Amino acid sequence: MEQESELLSLNTLARILTLYFSSEKGTKITPSALELITQYLRIYSKEAVCRAYEEKKNSIMSSSENEDIVLELEDLENGIAAQLALDFS
């Protein structure tokens, strides 16, 4: 597997998760579980960007315009996010 710089630290991820699970007393997460969640989020994010890029590339090619492909937030929101959530569930 390729080496990547850690953009989201495990401490940050743990803090984000505790915001959503703080109502349950004694809920803990192990470092190995944090690593797994980090990998899952990394794969999910890459897949979202790849799908949005391919979708945008196909729409640009069909309109026969010769322009650079630049992704916007809307490209991820329009159809990609819903289908990706279903595929990863």
Curated annotation (Swiss-Prot):
Keywords, alphabetical? Cytoplasm, DNA damage, DNA recombination, DNA repair, DNA-binding, Meiosis, Nucleus
GO molecular function terms attached to this record: DNA binding; protein heterodimerization activity
* Principal location: nucleus
Which top-rank group of organisms is this from? Eukaryota
Q: What GO CC annotations are associated with the protein?
A: CENP-T-W-S-X complex; cytosol; FANCM-MHF complex; nucleus
Where in or outside the cell it occurs: the entry states:
Nucleus; Cytoplasm
Q: Which GO terms describe its biological process?
A: double-strand break repair via synthesis-dependent strand annealing; kinetochore assembly; replication fork processing; resolution of meiotic recombination intermediates
Q: Reply yes or no: does the keyword Ubl conjugation apply.
A: no
For this protein, the record's InterPro entries field holds:
CENP-X (IPR018552), Histone-fold (IPR009072)
Q: Which CDD domains does the record match to this protein?
A: HFD_CENP-X
Q: What does this protein do?
A: Component of a FANCM-MHF complex that promotes gene conversion at blocked replication forks, probably by reversal of the stalled fork. FANCM-MHF promotes non-crossover recombination.
**Oligomer status and interactors:** The MHF histone-fold complex is a heterotetramer of 2 mhf1-mhf2 heterodimers. Component of the inner kinetochore constitutive centromere-associated network (CCAN) (also known as central kinetochore Sim4 complex in fission yeast), which is composed of at least cnl2, cnp3, cnp20, fta1, fta2, fta3, fta4, fta6, fta7, mal2, mhf1, mhf2, mis6, mis15, mis17, sim4 and wip1.
**What family is reported?**
Belongs to the CENP-X/MHF2 family.
**Cross-referenced PANTHER family, in alphabetical order?**
CENTROMERE PROTEIN X
Q: What is this protein called?
A: Inner kinetochore subunit mhf2
Which species is this UniProt entry from? Answer: Schizosaccharomyces pombe (strain 972 / ATCC 24843) (Fission yeast)
